[in-house]
């Protein structure tokens, strides 16, 4: 079972294509998207969890292999990857988990809480934008010798799209069409997300320290 963790603020086609490619590469029956509750490493305020959850539900609704989990949102407190994986193991004890995240996030894996346990809980798939250079050696030099199948790096052309760019485009009233599913574009517009001062009520009140993730 694939696990696509991220802030999804907002979710876009890069996330969806990455999940689809990883599912095909590893012949996964299902990919569960897990919007973070309070991402402990984000340096900016993030949109309210319910907004990010609903955008993810809208974006994944048309693919029967995709589902969305609230485990991180409903747990409360800062979101740590090891807690996400432990909860999903408890819910799906017979499934082997493939945790997918940005390759840039993997580069800072040593800063994650409980990083030693992560590779015992899941196989990791690092997805990267075209031109992003990250070799397995960069990570194994920190973690020691990983098992051969513990980590796979996959280049995803659609990850040239970024949530940061989508937020900036929304703030500047530039079009979001074809960067994310139509329903998400409409949700962003209806809820007036990412439009500067007008979206104060749509933001999380938690300010968090420096970060990573998709």
UniProtKB/Swiss-Prot annotation:
Top class in the EC scheme: transferase
Enzyme Commission code: 2.7.7.18
An MF annotation (GO) of this entry: nicotinate-nucleotide adenylyltransferase activity
One GO term (biological process): NAD biosynthetic process
Pathway listed: Cofactor biosynthesis; NAD(+) biosynthesis; deamido-NAD(+) from nicotinate D-ribonucleotide: step 1/1
CDD domains: NMNAT
Keywords attached to this entry: ATP-binding, NAD, Nucleotide-binding, Nucleotidyltransferase, Pyridine nucleotide biosynthesis, Transferase
Residues spanning the membrane: none
Catalytic activity: nicotinate beta-D-ribonucleotide + ATP + H(+) = deamido-NAD(+) + diphosphate
Function: Catalyzes the reversible adenylation of nicotinate mononucleotide (NaMN) to nicotinic acid adenine dinucleotide (NaAD).
Protein family: Belongs to the NadD family.
Record-given protein name: Probable nicotinate-nucleotide adenylyltransferase
Native source species: Mycobacterium tuberculosis (strain ATCC 25618 / H37Rv)
Gene label: nadD
């Amino acid at each position: 079972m694939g696990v696509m963790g991220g802030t999804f603020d907002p979710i876009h086609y890069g996330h969806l294509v990455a999940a689809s490619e990883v599912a095909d590469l590893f012949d996964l029956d299902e990919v569960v998207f897990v919007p973070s509750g309070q991402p402990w490493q984000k340096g900016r305020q993030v949109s309210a969890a319910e907004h990010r959850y609903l955008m993810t539900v809208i974006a994944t609704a048309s693919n029967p292999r995709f589902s969305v989990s609230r485990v991180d949102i409903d747990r409360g407190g800062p979101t740590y990857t090891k807690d996400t994986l432990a909860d999903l193991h408890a819910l799906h004890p017979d499934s082997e988990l493939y945790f997918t995240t940005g390759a840039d996030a993997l580069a800072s894996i040593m800063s994650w809480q409980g990083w030693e346990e992560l590779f015992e809980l899941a196989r990791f798939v690092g997805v990267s934008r075209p031109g992003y250079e990250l070799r397995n050696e960069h990570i194994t030099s920190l973690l020691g010798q990983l098992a051969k199948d513990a980590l796979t790096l996959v280049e995803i052309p659609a990850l040239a799209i970024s949530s940061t760019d989508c937020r900036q485009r929304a703030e500047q009233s530039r079009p979001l069409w074809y960067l994310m599913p139509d329903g998400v574009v409409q949700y962003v517009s209806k809820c007036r997300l990412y439009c500067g001062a007008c979206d104060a009520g749509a933001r999380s009140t938690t300010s968090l320290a420096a970060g990573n993730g998709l």
